[in-house]
Swiss-Prot record:
Transmembrane annotation, as ranges: none
Biological processes, Gene Ontology terms: defense response
Domain comment (free text): Has the structural arrangement of an alpha-helix connected to antiparallel beta-sheets by disulfide bonds (CS-alpha/beta).
Protein name: Beta-toxin Cbo4
Protein's cellular compartments: Secreted
Modification sites for Lysine amide: K66
Functional note: Beta toxins bind voltage-independently at site-4 of sodium channels and shift the voltage of activation toward more negative potentials thereby affecting sodium channel activation and promoting spontaneous and repetitive firing. Is active on the human voltage-gated sodium channels Nav1.4/SCN4A, Nav1.5/SCN5A and Nav1.6/SCN8A when tested at 200 nM. In vivo, is toxic to mice when intraperitoneally injected.
Gene Ontology terms, MF aspect: sodium channel inhibitor activity; toxin activity
Alphabetical list of PROSITE patterns matching this protein: LCN_CSAB
Length: 66
């Protein structure tokens, strides 16, 4: 599974400025999911790959980014 990392409180994606390989996104994906996850900056938000099927990613059901 893959998808944008999401803040559970706001419903917003984690933003990033440096597109492509991005240490911040890799770190956040691994902290949020697990060590084998990978991340990069895509469309100015952190995109995570190699996630488990039950991983919660953006968009959250019934929660819109404010």
């Amino acid at each position: 599974k893959e998808g944008y990392i999401v803040d559970y409180h706001t419903g917003c994606k984690y933003t990033c400025a440096k597109l492509g390989d991005n240490d911040y996104c890799v770190r956040e994906c691994r902290l949020r999911y697990y060590q084998s996850a990978h991340g990069y900056c895509y469309a100015f938000a952190c995109w995570c790959t190699h996630l488990y099927e039950q991983a919660v990613v953006w968009p959250l059901p019934n929660k819109r980014c404010k």
